[in-house]
Structure formats: C-alpha cells, structure tokens
Amino acid sequence: MQGGQEVGRESVSDLAEEPGEGSPHQTARGQSGDGLERRRICCDGPVVLPDTNANSSRLDEGLPTSCPHPGELSGGWGEFEGFRESSAKSEQFSQSFELLGRATECQPLRTPSVPEEGSSCQVQQGGPWVTGTAAGPSSESIPSYEKVFRLAFQEVAVEQAPEDVCSLDHFLERSNEGAASVPRLCSESRKLWRALQNTDTASASRCLWGESHCRENLLPVLGVDAAQKSPPGGQGHVLEGSDLRKPEELLAVSGFHLHHCKALIQTKLSGTSSSRQGSLITYSLFLKTPLQGNGRYITIPQKKIFTPRNLKMAFFNNDVC
C-alpha cells in the first residue's frame, strides 16, 4: 500500500517536473479532442466545437502553481471531463434535431380532402391550387361565391313607386289644370313666374312685382326685412346713372350707414345651364341707403342666387301667395 502511494506520488511529481513532455491538462485536451473527432466523423454534417483552448487556458489560470493533492486533481479532472462530454452530447443532440427538422420540411403537407395517392407530387408541382382528381375536390362540389351570396342574402321583391316630386317648370307650366296630382296655384303666381323667366320684359316684370301682394311675403323669405321697403311716390324705381356706384366708390362717401338701407328687389334674373345644380336663377337685389343732409340715395347692387327647387320652396312652401 505504501509502495503504491509512493509510486503514485512519484508519477505525479514527474508529470509536474516535466511540462515539456505533456501535462495532465494537455492529456485531457488530447483525450477529449480524440473523442470529439470520432463523433464528428460519425455525423454527416459539420459540427461547431467550442473553443477548447480558451477553456483550458482559463482552467490553467485557475490552478495554483504548486502541485495539488492527488485527490483534488482527480476530482477536478472528473468535473472537467464530465463538462466536456455533456457539451459534446448537447451539440450532437442539436445536430440530430436539425436533421430531423430538415426531413420533416421535405415531406409535403397533406389535407383531408386530398387523397394519399400521388398527393406529394401534385402539391409540389402546382401547390394547393392545382385542379385535378388528386390535387383537390372537383369544381362541381365547390359552390360559387355568387350562389353563396344569393343564398345568404335573398332578394326581396319591392314595388317600384315613382317619386312624387315635380319639377318647377312642370309645377307651373302644366296645361292640365284638373290633374289631381299637381296642386292648384293662384294665377298671380303663374303670371309672376313667367314674367321673371322672361329677361327681355324688365318693365313688365317690375309692374307685376309692384302690383303683386307676394312682395310683402317674399321679402322675409329672401332674407330682406319687410319693413325696409322702397319709399312711396315712385322713388322706389332703380335710379340710372350717377346713383349706381361701384363698391370702392362707396368707401369715400362720408356719412354712409348701411343700417339705414331701403330694400328694392329688381326682378331681373340670369340663368346658367352648365352648373352642377342645374340652372341657377340670380336676383339683383339693390339696397338703397339715404345720404345725410341732401335726401339722395345710393344704390348698392347685390345678388342672391337660387336654384329652381329652392326658389319653388321660397315661393310656395312659405305661404308667399
């Protein structure tokens, strides 16, 4: 027993005294390297090995300079060898898992509706959109989207009813007075509407407008105060010449107050047929304001634009007649 221990100590001391021949760490690296080399030859793919030199150098730095106890050396060597073997086994397991994943990727996907015979070739060549007996169900078994929508949203028969909305021309110029669908209007409104549509007869339209009782009711509808009427005695006519001034000239007039304006509606209109809303009817609205001191009036031309439907609403739906 004592002789065996002395021989073991001498062998350990010999290894410690002769570092050139080979240290226990170098031998461990050689053995672990041989084992990893065998595993790499058995495997098909390349295996990435960890840096054994760095691990061994860190282990060499951690060991003391003096020779340790043989029990401590054997225990440290066992832990180091077990660590190397576990890392090699984990690398081998990861490599086999990658090979298994590649093998499963190569296999084609199967659907329940696709038969097993020749399904892999059909799916790989044309994908899931290949039509045929092996690639998918027949076209007769697949209902079209149109049929699905017709079954889901069934058509309901609706009675087509015409709109009970008459145009303004049809509303005013209808020859058949006895029609029940068209409401009866007063003759004065018809005459006034025809005169307004005729732009050549300005004097006649002015007379009709002055004689019509619709003027009192139409002024508030058009946004004009009914109390601000033209002064009596024929002064309500539009003054030609010097009284018609441009808006920039009105700024130079002293004592101009807009709140003293007198309203006069000139029954002159112009229509445009190229508008999106149809023909637009423009009324020339003149505001007459008195100048302080001389009793003269300044006429301010303004415009109000109406579509035929809005004009019809203004005339007949606001109790103008």
Curated annotation (Swiss-Prot):
Disulfide bonds: none annotated. Transmembrane segments: none annotated. Pfam families: Clathrin_bdg (PF15045). GO terms for cellular component: trans-Golgi network membrane. Coiled coil: none annotated. It comes from the Eukaryota. Signal peptide: none annotated. Residues 1-80 are annotated as: Disordered. One of its GO terms (molecular function) is clathrin binding. One of its GO terms (biological process) is intracellular transport. PANTHER family: AFTIPHILIN A-RELATED, CLATHRIN BINDING BOX OF AFTIPHILIN CONTAINING 1. This is Uncharacterized protein CLBA1. The lineage of its organism: Eukaryota, Metazoa, Chordata, Craniata, Vertebrata.
